[in-house]
Amino acid sequence: MKMAKAWISFLLLILAVTVCIGCSHVDKTDVEGVITNELNLLKNLDSDTVHKYVAYEELFPDVKGKAELSNEVEEVFSLFFKDFDYKILEIDVGQDKMSATARLKLSTLDTKALAKDYDTAHLEDAILSAASGSDENPDSLESRYLILNELLKNRQYDTVETDCSMELKNTGTDTEEWEIVRTYDLENNLVGGLMTYLSDSDLLTPEETLTVYLNTLKTMDLNQMSNYLGIESLLNTSDEAKSSIAAALVEQVHNNFDFKISGSDIQSYKATVNTELTTFDSSTILETYQNELTEYLNSPDAVIDGSQKRYEHSLELLLKNIEENTVTVTSPVSFYLINDGVSWKLTDESQSLSSGIFGNLVSTPVAEDMDGYEDGSEEEYSEDDSYEEDDSSYEE
């Protein structure tokens, strides 16, 4: 009799364990079904599901206000999730069956590379917008998404795998109804950490940031360079002769300007980036111009020509020497950047860039009034009166 009771107890224990295991398996299957359904919708580019987990504003939380978004913006998430994939590694259901945790492996785009490309393109747009005096806001939500759209359409990014945990809760009463708990970490994981990278103020280093500034400068036209570098006295003019000189100088920049970064020093939110700048040799241009001008002013023609013609001929000589120049010079120039908590930014860029690129030609050496040359003498142009580069660092 005792033996029979023991067997009955043992069988009941086995049955209870089996039932528990079965229930646990059912619970895990239910949880897995919810996860699979939701993530498959992401894979299939269901816009409602995308917006459910990633709101437009959450990628760029610093942008204030809302705006209607174009079809190109809608397309960003379709392009982003086209290679999205996942694998459920483990599911753990709580004993009270009210919560569950799932561990997954997600396959997403290399969002660090995407974010660095975005930061580069966004900075380029901001620089050119400032140089053009454009009314368009490069920091608007739509402008930012249009950059992402262009990058995702025109560039190929590798896929990377990351581990992700997901929390679920049972919202049912009579029957189990599992629901994925939306959190910042989950949203960030679903987009491969893009939210973290886009908010990283150090994603572009000071050296990389300066590289964007200098490369963008190479692409500027006459008006953009004039506005951006703040040298309107030389480049921004309605005078036809001076306009020709300004255009020739910009052409010299396009043909000769280059740079090499030799090192950097970062102290907290301040950085110094040392470079070797190569540009046209303004000193050679001025020396040749001054010699030819002296020869002309000492000639009888200068007296006969009168003040206005002497002025016009001086401009012609300067233009000729700029256009014919093939001499370059390489000089060390230090640039200073500050991290404002959003990104690294070049400080006093107009002053440091204009002096580094144009040297002594940051202002015209041609005197407006040539009356002082009536007796054949000349008023020497002094480099001491020219723009002096300020090598002083920011104050600590």
What are these regions (language model features)?
Residues 1-10:
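Bacterial N-terminal signal peptides that target proteins for export
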Residues 9-17:
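Hydrophobic helical h-region of N-terminal Sec-dependent signal peptides
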Residues 19-22:
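C-terminal motif of bacterial Sec signal peptides marking the signal peptidase cleavage site
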Residues 25-79, 83, 191-261, 284-286:
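Core segments of small alpha/beta cavity-forming domains
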Residues 54, 86-88, 168, 259-261, ...:
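Fold-core signature of tandem repeat domains
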Residues 71-151, 245-321, 375-396:
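Surface-exposed, charged secondary-structure patches
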Residues 113, 120-201, 295-309, 323-374:
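Short beta-strand edge/turn micro-motifs at domain boundaries
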Residues 217-224, 268, 281, 293, ...:
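Charged, low-complexity helical/coil segments in non-catalytic cytosolic or luminal regions
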